[in-house]
């Protein structure tokens, strides 16, 4: 037995951006493409040892990320450029590292997070798009974004989101705290921006699906509040499609001092 000391272990956080349209979600699964699998493979090549990552939020199939955060541990000592440029050179073109930061032992990408923020982008036009067709959700009926915004404000604060929770959701509780929800129009694009401490499964897409019914004047503004109070998923609208959804930011305590690049996607301001 050697008395050599164990090499030091480094804990590293990364900001990750990805186009989820060609993946079966974030989480590694057997025999299907996942973002986690591609990232771990690229990191393992740079570290020259097996790497396992932990993420802030496991996005579903077809959902994108501009502000995903992960952490991993490694004995490999590398310069920041290796974890950014080097890893990116080993990643497919639809996944990229945006930043790197050494973090203390008590940091965890999921459990240290205090809030997550999503943006849902609707291309509101009579005709379907060709460019960015997998990065927006097409809705052909005219939408009243101001009406959608007003209807959504009842979701602020701590509420039971059973009516906007997927049937297969495994969370112990349907209660979540929504910090803001804003609906704005940018030309033909309608953007739903929502931030909460955490989300139940399909929560954003289920909220957006019902807000589109209000925006299209198929339901009154009061309908969202009625759905929230009913605590019945079967009364709400269908789940909005995955392709318009982006995880754009994750909040952490200031002491971790993580970078905060522009959220996007694309030209959308913070």
Curated annotation (Swiss-Prot):
Pfam families: PseudoU_synth_1. Residues 168-172 are annotated as: Interaction with tRNA. Substrate binds at residue 118. Its EC number is 5.4.99.12. The record marks 58, 78, 110, 126, 139 as: Interaction with tRNA. GO terms for molecular function: RNA binding; tRNA pseudouridine(38-40) synthase activity. It comes from the Bacteria. The active site is at residue 60. SUPFAM superfamilies: Pseudouridine synthase. InterPro entries: PsdUridine_synth_cat_dom_sf (IPR020103), PsdUridine_synth_TruA (IPR001406), PsdUridine_synth_TruA_a/b_dom (IPR020097), PsdUridine_synth_TruA_C (IPR020095), TruA/RsuA/RluB/E/F_N (IPR020094). One of its GO terms (biological process) is tRNA pseudouridine synthesis. Residues 107-111 are annotated as: RNA binding. It catalyses: uridine(38/39/40) in tRNA = pseudouridine(38/39/40) in tRNA. PANTHER family: PSEUDOURIDYLATE SYNTHASE, TRNA PSEUDOURIDINE SYNTHASE-LIKE 1. NCBIfam families: hisT_truA (TIGR00071). Formation of pseudouridine at positions 38, 39 and 40 in the anticodon stem and loop of transfer RNAs. Belongs to the tRNA pseudouridine synthase TruA family. Homodimer. This is tRNA pseudouridine synthase A. The lineage of its organism: Bacteria, Pseudomonadati, Pseudomonadota, Gammaproteobacteria, Enterobacterales. The gene is truA.
């Amino acid at each position: 037995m050697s008395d050599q000391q164990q090499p030091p272990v480094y804990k590293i956080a990364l900001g990750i951006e990805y186009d989820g349209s060609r993946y079966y979600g974030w989480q590694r699964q057997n025999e299907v493409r996942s973002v986690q699998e591609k990232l771990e493979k690229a990191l393992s090549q740079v570290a020259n040892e097996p790497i396992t990552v932990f993420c802030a939020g496991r996005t579903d199939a077809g959902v994108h990320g501009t502000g995903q955060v992960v952490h991993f541990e490694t004995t490999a000592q590398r310069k920041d450029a290796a974890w950014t440029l080097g890893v990116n050179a080993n990643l497919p073109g639809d996944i990229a590292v945006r930043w790197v930061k050494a973090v203390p032992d008590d940091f965890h990408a999921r459990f240290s997070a205090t809030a997550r923020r999503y943006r849902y982008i609707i291309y509101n036009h009579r005709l379907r798009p060709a460019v960015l067709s997998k990065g927006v959700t097409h809705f052909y009926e005219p939408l009243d974004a101001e009406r959608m915004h007003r209807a959504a404000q009842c979701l602020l604060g701590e509420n039971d989101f059973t009516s906007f929770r997927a049937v297969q959701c495994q969370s112990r509780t349907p209660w979540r705290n929504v910090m803001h929800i804003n609906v704005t129009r940018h030309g033909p694009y309608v953007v739903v921006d929502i931030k909460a401490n955490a989300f139940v499964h399909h929560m954003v897409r289920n909220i957006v699906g019902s807000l589109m019914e209000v925006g299209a004047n198929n339901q009154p503004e009061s309908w969202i509040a009625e759905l929230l109070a009913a605590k019945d998923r079967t009364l709400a609208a269908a789940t909005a499609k995955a392709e318009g959804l982006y995880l754009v930011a994750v909040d952490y305590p200031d002491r971790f001092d993580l970078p905060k690049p522009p959220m996007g996607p694309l030209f959308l301001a913070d």
